[in-house]
Amino acid sequence: MASLSHAFGRGGFVAVKIARRDEPTSEQLASSVILTGTSALRMMRAERRQMGYISWRDLDPDEERRVLHASSPSAEDIYLPDLVRIGAVSGEAQEDLCLLVGSAAQRRRMPGVGWSVCSGLPVGSILEVEPGVYSLSPEALCVAVAREVGCIQAFALAQELCSKISLSDRGKYLPPYTSPVTNKLAKDKDQPADVGYFEVEPVLTPDRLADYLAVCKGNAAKQLQRLCPYLSENLRSPMECIMLALFSLPFSYGGFACGPFKTDYKIEFDDRAQAISGMPHAVCDAYQEAARFDLEYNGELGHSSRRGRIHDEKRNMGLITMGIEVATVNNEMLCDMEAVEALAWRMHQRMRKRYRNRVDARRKKQEALLNTLRACFGLKPV
């Protein structure tokens, strides 16, 4: 049966033709594995690191149902070197393999294996990694994280998958970290050596995730669906992801309700702006259209050199000439909730709105959101 496997390349949505192949037998399906949880997350990050995108094969609805309801692997069916090769497990650390089956009766008693049971999944939930090995799709993995870990952690994972970054698949612990003990592994710097990230292509869009969540059941999926409008696309660093989440998410989650932002947004300069900047246009990290406000994250890379500073100064003068206010945020400022709130107040003022955050214990909520996001992207709490 011929099918199409979808991947995101530099040109956008790409369809890759898959050769015609025979249907797997019932015995082959029974011995197959469906990876979920940490195992699927590790493998997805390994695939993005190696390929730059996800090359796995889509299944048609009938195939998905047959795989889910037939998979019941035994210990003899699980060959660890193959799972290490495709990135599902780390060869360096002892960890449970996370597998998905369609019913409790399909589980086998095996040491080192954690089972998740789900009798039905929406179309587009399972991808074929290679014959006999399947994984949750990016959308389905976000829902699994929302149900098993938390909604903000799932939002952070979705933001990673919508961005041009992938966190490391190596090491004993993977973000999102869930305890202070494992947080100690990360460094204070923006790009800790223990975690790091890779430049890749996005494998998800906010609209695609929202469409998937619309047919999912359960409170966790519905809560995550409400957060989809606050996701951004094509971000290029973990700190940009944290910055946009803080400024975009509603007050009730600990955010500052300044969204939506347009990322990588091109502003064409008029004659005066071109004359003062020497540039035909500027590309904004995060542009708030209603406020005519450009929010820039200033990391160390590319901004600390003399040439980089001069470029930024000219660019900012061009934007100011166009009536666009520019604010530059760094890691230190993002850790100061009073400073972030002052900037959010200014954005609301530019939108002709009053900044009214009436959430009880709002500072604690804001700090909790910041530390949860930092943990999700492999950074220590502040």
List each model region and its residues.
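Short gly/ser-rich loop at a beta-strand->alpha-helix junction or flexible surface loop bordering the NTP-binding
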Residues: 1-220, 359, 369-382
